[in-house]
Amino acid sequence: LQSKMAYTAQITRNTPTAFLFLVDHSISMQKMTSLFGEEMTMAEAAARIVNRQINELVYRCIKSNETRHYYDIAVIGYGERAYSGWNGDLEGRDFVSPEELREHPYKKIITREEKRTRKGVVVKEVEKVQWVEAQHDGSWTHLHEAFSKAQQLLNQWMEKHHDKDCYPPTIINITDGEFNGATRESLLQQANELKSMFTNDGNVILFNIHFTASKSAAEVVCPIEISELRGNSYAETLFNMSSLLPERYNADISR
C-alpha cells in the first residue's frame, strides 16, 4: 500500500469502486423481523435494504441526466450454491453499471421509509425501484460459496483496475447468520482473504448485516466490542469476520 492515508481516493469514472451485496436466500430467512416499524420476512427486509442502497448509488451517479460509471455493482444470492442475485433483464449478470441499472429496473413497489423533517423523523410511504426480489427457498446456507464467488469477481475487478488509485471495493453480507456446510474457522479464513485484497487506497471492506427474529433484541449498530452482542454466537462470528470501520468514518458514525 502507498503511504498516503487510506480510504481517501476520489471516486470518479476513471477511478471507480465496486459494491458486492451477498444476500442469504436460505429457508431460515422466511422468519419474521421488523424494518422501519413494518413486519416482514427477513428475506423481504434484505431485499429492501439492497434495493434501497442500489437506488441511492444510482442516484449519486446521475449528473445532468447522464448516468456516470462511478461504481460496478454485483448482487450474489446464496443458499446451497452462490449465483447472480439480479432479477429481470439483468438476471444472470455479475457486475453491472449504474447506467444499466437505471435503464433496466425490475419493478416498482410502495415501501415505508424513515424521513428526517424539521419536526423529527417520520415514516412515509414512497415508491421505490427494485432490481432484487426477496427469496428464502435455499435448503442450505453456504456462505462459503458466496465468499468464493465474491473473491472470483473481485480478482477480475482488481486485475482491471490494479494500476488505478481506486477506493477499495465494499462487500455487504446480509444474513441471519445460520450458516452451514463449512466450519467457523474456514469462514473466518475466507473473510480474512477477502479483507486482505487491496487497491492503492486500502483493503477491501467487509460489512455484515445480521437479522434476528427476537423481538426483545435491541438494534446494535457498528458495535465496537463483541460484548455488545449479548452472547449471540451467530452475531459474534459475523463480528469477527467484519472489517474495522476506517478511522475517517468514526466521526460520522458517532453523530
What are these regions (language model features)?
Residues L1-R255:
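Acidic, low-complexity intrinsically disordered regions
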